[in-house]
Amino acid sequence: MGGTFDPIHHGHLVAASEVAAKFGLDEVVFVPTGQPWQKSHKLVSRPEHRYLMTVIATASNPRFTVSRVDVDRPGPTFTIDTLRDLRAERPDADLFFITGADALAQILSWKDVDELWSLAHFVGVTRPGHELHDMGRDDVSLLEVPAMAISSTDCRTRVGAGNPVWYLVPDGVVQYIAKYGLYAAPANAADLTPALSGSDDQARTE
């Protein structure tokens, strides 16, 4: 499951669990982006913060793991590079790439799209009330997940306004955000990194 995870919230976790159950997945690998292209107009939390919050959030589920392939790779994050790295680590696995359905609609503009189809089955998750458009491909599935009504943007806004995010994000992540003062106003520049400008893919689950 690829995403910025800034912060990871219960919507991400429920979506991962629902997809795992529907498709009989043995493992869900969460892959926090390194330097996301499509957040070019925003500052995002440093990759290490987002990685550690994801580790904390997934620790209690033995089916969930977290990969550093995007965090450790220098330069911008492209889904094709993520999938190539995961394929190299798991050459015999059937890979499913979980992302937001709105992001999936842009897949034809992604880097090396023809190779993407050969590397993984794509699953787009969305919130209730969001219209799902069938892409007409056997290697693309769409799944409605009620908890996806939660968004990372709303969580950041709530923290910045001094409002609680308990029960929107896992307890350990709430404590991590408070410990490092993430999303508080004014933000600590040392905890932020600019996303790279560009027009390519990396529109994943927020």
From Swiss-Prot:
Keywords: ATP-binding, NAD, Nucleotide-binding, Nucleotidyltransferase, Pyridine nucleotide biosynthesis, Transferase. It comes from the Bacteria. Its EC number is 2.7.7.18. Pfam families: CTP_transf_like. The keyword Membrane does not apply. Disulfide bonds: none annotated. It is an enzyme of class 2 (transferase). GO terms for biological process: NAD biosynthetic process. CDD domains: NMNAT. Belongs to the NadD family. Catalyzes the reversible adenylation of nicotinate mononucleotide (NaMN) to nicotinic acid adenine dinucleotide (NaAD). This is Probable nicotinate-nucleotide adenylyltransferase. It comes from Paenarthrobacter aurescens (strain TC1).
